């Protein structure tokens, strides 16, 4: 018979703003500033894919993903990485259905994505009501809900978005992880009140910066967890395929319901 037991579910989460696999370095701004956003590199994408695969993550959050525009040669970068990992993927344009950006070439294919092993209950897309980047992806696993965000560049818009996010995660009946690129130019101090109000803490206890990738000075990329989640490892790997470094987090969900087979 099958007997329900309390156990710790161990998972590895990797979150990476890959900047559409456009690379880094001085050439990114030639022949004019920001020109690199118009050209993606399969070599960079393959490097990102190899790195992600080597970490053997259970869940991957990808930010600034090209979902198949002319820039990437019609390659859906989320699907490309997912296929290499043998993972399920869900992705969406980050601007919201009513945004004019949905009608612009290249831009309309800019999104965020989750990749996960096939033990997924469901995913939901939510949208902030302010800011340009509005997408929130909610990924519900058996024992935890994970929210992937890319917050606004403007401070005032970020604060509105954090208020919306607080109300959204309060509805979850499972332990919660909120992760992504928060664009917090003052680091953890900027989201301190949000974390306290939402009952979250940062997995990055030493406040290791993740941006810019070459010599990180700012903590932009976060993994925030609720009290039921135990962090067993956190790392910001020295990887330079993008202007951000990835964040890697191993965690246990304490008190998760597992099952075992007992023989009478």
Each predicted region: which residue ranges?
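Active-site beta-strand/loop signature of hydrolases that rely on acidic residues for catalysis
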Residues: 12-17, 47-72, 146-149, 165-193, ...
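Alpha-helical scaffold elements lining the catalytic groove of polysaccharide deacetylases
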Residues: 155-167
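Active site of divalent-metal-dependent phosphoester/diester hydrolases
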Residues: 69-74, 87-114, 183-248
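Structured beta-strand-rich core segments of catalytic domains in phosphoester-bond hydrolases
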Residues: 2-5, 10, 64-143, 235-238
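Short, structured patches in soluble enzyme cores that scaffold and shape functional sites
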Residues: 127, 148-151
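N-terminal, active-site-proximal structural segment of metallo-dependent hydrolase catalytic domains
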Residues: 1-84, 91-99, 163, 254-264
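Active-site beta-strand termini and strand-to-loop segments that position acidic
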Residues: 18, 115-118, 137-143, 226-227, ...
